[in-house]
């Protein structure tokens, strides 16, 4: 990872889905920049692994907080625990990154009500619940960065429900940017395929014999993104130097939706 200075030293960062993929990469960049980082997840084992990885990569320690973002009470409890650990009545959550997400490729005719609820709960309700819990601590110059997908701006085959949930994230971002202005900035990152364990699992589940090389061939840049590249965009959006950006939807897709 290239060392970059985002101006986030001393800031408090909370990242959902922070134990793997984009969320973990963002945690690494924020830690390297000198921020205090809390990562949220549902697995104590993966949380412990993530903390060890971050310590090895940065020489700095993050804090893992157990939280299922689909449960409103757990979101409130997680934020309250962070506030307690911060130990100040005037504690401010400077940067909230909503990175927790769920993907399953299913055609519309295959969907059950349970399928709908499972994806909507993580991708939409979870984001809203955690942001709602954080609201009392989002103060002047705080930032929210939501992670959507290129599927929010360009339809993908075989995943209408996923596209719908990520489209909701884009709409939520724009509305929240208006609601929280002028004190809090809210922006959204829309990545395409990213080299993460989630993508590897998707390819394995597809049973079509597709490889990462096959996926990369569809991109003008002839490759997919590394999680660190998406993390760089997240950190840049939250950086104090980008203080005039809010309500922005930033597509990071290697030119996939350019033509």
Question: What function would you assign to each model-found segment?
Answer:
Residues 131, 165, 173:
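Active-site helix of classical SDR
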Residues 149:
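Residue(s) in the substrate-gating loop at a strand-loop-helix junction
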């Amino acid at each position: 990872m290239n060392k970059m200075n985002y101006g986030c030293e001393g800031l408090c960062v909370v990242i959902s889905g922070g134990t793997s993929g984009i969320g973990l990469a963002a945690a690494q960049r924020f830690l390297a920049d000198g921020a205090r980082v809390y990562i949220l997840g549902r697995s104590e084992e993966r949380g412990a692994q993530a903390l060890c990885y971050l310590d090895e990569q940065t020489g700095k320690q993050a804090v893992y907080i157990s939280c299922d973002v689909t449960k409103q009470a757990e979101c409130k409890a997680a934020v309250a625990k962070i506030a307690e650990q911060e130990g100040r009545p005037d504690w401010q959550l400077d940067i909230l990154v909503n990175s927790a997400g769920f993907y399953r490729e299913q055609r519309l005719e295959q969907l059950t009500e349970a399928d709908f609820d499972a994806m909507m709960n993580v991708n939409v309700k979870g984001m809203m619940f955690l942001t709602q819990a954080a609201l009392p601590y989002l103060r002047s110059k705080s930032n929210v960065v939501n992670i959507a997908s290129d599927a929010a701006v360009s339809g993908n085959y075989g995943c209408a429900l996923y596209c719908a949930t990520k489209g909701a994230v884009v709409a939520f971002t724009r509305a929240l940017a208006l609601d929280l202005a002028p004190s809090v900035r809210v922006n959204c990152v829309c990545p395409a395929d990213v080299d993460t364990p989630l993508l590897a699992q998707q390819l394995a589940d597809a049973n079509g014999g597709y490889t990462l090389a096959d996926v990369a061939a569809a991109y003008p840049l002839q490759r997919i993104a590394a999680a660190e590249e998406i993390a760089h965009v997240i950190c840049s959006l939250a950086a104090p130097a980008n203080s005039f950006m809010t309500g922005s939807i930033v597509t990071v897709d290697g030119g996939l939706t350019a033509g």
